[in-house]
Amino acid sequence: MQVSPAIVKGIAVSSLGLYAGILTSSTVISITTPINVLTQHLKNVLCTLGCWSTVLGGLATGAFGLSYYLAAPGERPNYLLCGLGVAPLSAAYLYLVSLFNHKLAPKCTRDQNDLEKQKDEKLPQHHPEVKDGEAACPFSKMNNAKTLKPESERSVKCHSYMSLHMSIVTGITIFTFGKCILDGFKA
């Protein structure tokens, strides 16, 4: 049974598009939501989005690799290599930034100023009021009675640092997705 390169390219580009969409959603949620709501009420939702983005990123990487392999040696377009590398490179980049942010940077600890800033953060317009220990995300499996481990709570400074890097990766992923679509029409 022979696999059509066009079908594999379609799967690759579709997976990359879904990956870019999930990454964009995660970034928007992270930027617009105060850190205390993220760590207390939306942590499971973001973890689920992370799992799905890993699956879709792996599928896109595999499909782009297979498309590149199936293409004739003289007709291997560059966008296949771009699509092949974007998910693993973005995952590695975010992992290293997160590692630096949470393990190696001693300045990313909570202090009294962070707690005051966090209390002053505004929720998005028309969002119900969230008080510590009362509200929970309807999609979260987390029980309100459970307390978080201290290392899962991050400072406002760390939150803004990670949001910046997530925005960078999201922009690069969306650009690569657009490049794959436009270059795919040329071929």
From Swiss-Prot:
Key words of the record: Membrane, Transmembrane, Transmembrane helix
GO BP annotations, alphabetical order: autophagy of mitochondrion; macroautophagy
Bias (Basic and acidic residues): 114-134
InterPro entries for this protein: ATG33
Membrane topology: Multi-pass membrane protein
Superkingdom per UniProt: Eukaryota
Keyword flag Cytoplasm: no
Transmembrane segments: 11-31, 45-65, 80-100, 162-182
Span list, region Disordered: 114-135
GO cellular component, one term: mitochondrion
Annotated localization: Membrane
Similarity section: Belongs to the ATG33 family.
Note from the entry: Present with 3210 molecules/cell in log phase SD medium.
Protein's name according to its UniProt entry: Protein SCM4
UniProt source species: Saccharomyces cerevisiae (strain ATCC 204508 / S288c) (Baker's yeast)
